[in-house]
Amino acid sequence: MNLDNIINILFKHMELNNLVDDSDVDNIIKQFPESVYYGEMYRCMNVVGDIQVTDIWQSWSSSKESACLVCDGLRSGIQKGSKRVVLKQNSIGIDLIKLLRLIKQMDISEEQKKKVCRLLRSYRYEKEILARINYTYEIVE
C-alpha cells in the first residue's frame, strides 16, 4: 500500500466517519508498527428498551469520558426514559496522530505534506484511533 493510498483512507475515515476495512488497518500497521494502539475503546449510547436511539455510526473513543461527552451532545430530543449504556472493548488499531507525525517526518511531496497537515489539524483535539471493531464488548454502565 503506497502513501497516497494511506492518506486517502485517512481522509475517507475523517470525512465519512466510516469504518475502514480490517485489511487496510493491517496493512498500515505493517508499514508503521510504531503507530499501533492497543487498549480499551468505549462507546456510549442512549437506549430505550432494546432500541438504540443515538446515532448508530457514533465512533468508538479511547476514553469513557470522551465517549459520554459525544453521547451527551446527542441527548437533546431523546425520548424520556432512555438510559445510557457504555460499551467497552479491547482493540487493536492505529493512533492516527502518531501515524501522521511519522508520515510527516518522511521524505514526502509538498502536496502530501499539505494533506497530512490538514489531517493533523482535524485530529488535534482528542486521541483519535482507527480501530478494528470486532464487536466483542462488555457493558460497563
Which functions belong to the PLM regions below?
Residues 1-41, 48-141:
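Conserved NAD+-utilizing ADP-ribose enzyme module
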